[in-house]
Amino acid sequence: MDGVPPGGELDGIRCENVECLTFANESFDLITSTDVFEHVEDDIRGFREIARVLKPGGAFIFTVPLDETSPTLIRGKRAADGSIHHLAPPEYHGDPMRGMTVYTWRTYGIDITDRLAQAGLAARCEFVVTHGVAMRVPVIVAHANR
């Protein structure tokens, strides 16, 4: 959250930067996130932080928008002046906490488990049948490689 330091609170909610978590190594048995990592500028760094704070045998279970027919699409890179250089049409998702939209750095694809492996996480992708907006939701289950 803008203006809140990592580890600080806003309205009773702890705020963290997943690229630089304030938790000690091996702090958690389980970490979950729902449609977050597509908004993380350096997702590999964020995945490494998840691996760092997972206890041995711990699990990271998360969802992201995933195109199972293509490799990950990188939508933009940070330019030297701090602006975003778009490599694909920009995409934004709503942020109910801030009442605004958030840039989507990538749309994950069939190579997501390779991206997690770069960060020291062994992963598999499962598809869960749901009712509502989407009928099949990809759920990624990852474990630290230690």
Protein language model annotation of sequence segments:
Residues 3-5, 13-15, 41-146:
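S-adenosyl-L-methionine-dependent methyltransferase catalytic module, highlighting the catalytic core
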Residues 16-31:
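A short acidic, Gly/Pro-enriched loop at the edge of an enzyme's catalytic core
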Residues 17-19, 36, 104:
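Residues marking the start of alpha-helices
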Residues 20, 38, 68:
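Active-site micro-motifs of SAM-dependent methyltransferase domains
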Residues 29-41:
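A short SAM/SAH-binding and catalytic strip from SAM-dependent methyltransferases
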